[in-house]
Amino acid sequence: MASTTFALDVAEKALLEHGFFALDDSLVGDRIWEMEERGFPYFTEYGLDFCRQFAFDQRIRSILENSFEKCSLGHWLRYEEFPGHVECFRRGGPRAGRRVLVVHLWAKGSQVAYYVGSHLHEMATSRSRRSLYEIPLSELDRVGSKPKHKDFPDGGIVILDARLGFEIKEGYAITFLYATDEVIANWAKIVLPYSKALVEKVSDMEKESTRIGLNFAFEVSPGGKAT
């Protein structure tokens, strides 16, 4: 218990000061490779098992519950390399506050640069081609934010403040976003095809934590209205 508490203290300090924290995990690279080999079947029984394993990882859950009174998983996509472009999921610096946290699950061989402390500054941004916010290097220079380069030959996990700037130089990250209730209320739901098996999977996932919800909905039938 003491080591877990210490690790949580270290993670919280890193998130506050640097904007990100890397978790050691020797399994994630192989699990992502399996996911890729299957064609990234997110909304299947296999996909939800993958989601449950990592989205509710005990270490991630501890950080989320330490950061938020309540939050929900509201975004689950894969982001590929985009060298030469620094992006963030949320802008606004201190004015926006920490209301969204991101988990990057890095595939083997991925390389990324995280811009240390950039979450603490309000900067001019523009919309990137994949609907994130792009931060000009001139703005990062203005606030004195320098890149911390991370290589993941075997894959890896990083949890970060959604306001933090990052550049995916090589590879890709399967990405989870968790947001507070007031933020998630404005997000579209993740719509899953209806099946009894998937409903049961989601129900089991919802039992993992009373403080981390799922912004999921099911189609009534193929092409039907989500509920």
Task: Annotate each PLM feature.
Residues 1-6, 224-227:
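Eukaryotic N-terminal low-complexity, Ser/Thr- and Lys/Arg-rich leader segments
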Residues 214-227:
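Contiguous surface segments at macromolecular interaction interfaces
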Residues 178-215:
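Double-stranded beta-helix
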Residues 4-19, 24-156, 162-193:
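Non-heme Fe(II) oxygenase catalytic core, chiefly the N-lobe of the double-stranded beta-helix
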